[in-house]
Swiss-Prot record:
One of its GO terms (biological process) is queuosine biosynthetic process. Its EC number is 6.3.4.20. It catalyses: 7-carboxy-7-deazaguanine + NH4(+) + ATP = 7-cyano-7-deazaguanine + ADP + phosphate + H2O + H(+). Binds 1 zinc ion per subunit. This is 7-cyano-7-deazaguanine synthase.
Amino acid sequence: MKRAVVVFSGGQDSTTCLIQALHQYDEVHCVTFDYGQRHRAEIDVARELALKLGARAHKVLDVTLLNELAVSSLTRDSIPVPDYEPDADGIPNTFVPGRNILFLTLTAIYAYQVKAEAIITGVCETDFSGYPDCRDEFVKALNHAVDLGMAKEIRFETPLMWLDKAETWALADYWEKLELVRTETLTCYNGIKGDGCGQCAACNLRSNGLNHYLANKPAVMSAMKAKTGLK
């Protein structure tokens, strides 16, 4: 039996990954992390979606220690979430240091216990927003370290790594779940479900990608298929 574990936040990217995994694996588990994030509604959204989409199990892990260590606008109410700035340089204050290191490592421990062969994460280098822990080289390096530390091969899969946001929408549409992803996921840094606040970087990236996809469906769908190998 082919098993996979999805690192699941209830946002657009991880939900699209879950949808695809459910078509490609016999059994899919989800792991969501409570790290004291600013908008805890995402945990409730993740629970609802994991149940609705048919995950075999959904584990919510308490990692609130991360909140004490990682200072970010996503973990501190006192730090305002910035509006979208198209020419911004450097690492944004929405970056949570160590988050993906911790999430992927703990998910690997869970995957080891349930005998899953793969961990699926929705990180993306094309639209990585300045987050160093969304880069392909980081994921591959951590995957290698985890395999060595567990003396077991657990594959880290990143199906969105080379897709832009329009192509990620195309992937959701390919699996006939575009409307669900648009209306029922929570990607907004200000904690607003669906189309979000329309002001933060996450909402801007998401809406621009959707608009581009809807205006150029055949071309974007073709590009997505070429990158993913889907027919």
